[in-house]
Amino acid sequence: RACGLPQAPLDDLAAFHVIFGKTVPDVSLNAVANLGYAQGRWRAQVYAGDTLRSSSEVIGLKENSSRTSGVVYVRTRGTNQRGEIVMDYVRWVMVRKRDAEAAAPETVVPELKRALTVADLAIPAGLTFAKYDFAQAGEPHRLGDYAVGEVIDHVDGVTIEEAEHMMATRLWQNTAKVHFDATFREDGRR
């Protein structure tokens, strides 16, 4: 609240994964590969108790040279219970063709920005860091503490086991087969 927000918002990546997870059954449940993301914007804060929904628009299609698969480009919008867009992003996914002999769709590859501009970003109304307590947050480093080319060794590594991988994907409601079925991939890996 000291930062001008009504309460602590959910972590942005938690909100992203919930919105992303809702798209999996319709976009990438049986994907060969999730290829990339672009133009991701968090446009409004998400708070505990919000209801999130996702909708995706197909904005591009391209058959691969193998003619057995292709790339689908989608723009996904996540909204809250008030219909406010809380985030949007573009992603592209490689999927198999239903019929390898089917004619290729018209190729449409969307033009995507290489990077977002400051004008593309949304700053929550009322947000201020004038009273933010950096010491209480446990983060002593500021912009002037870093240098270009500096290497930071993050010593606290962690091993993610299969059970944790599956638990995380279930938590975010990501039902893509590759996360749960070791027989889905030819190499037997997830």
PLM features: residue spans?
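HotDog/MaoC-like acyl-thioester-processing domains
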Residues: 44-133, 143
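Hot-dog-fold acyl-thioester-processing enzymes
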Residues: 1-37, 98-190
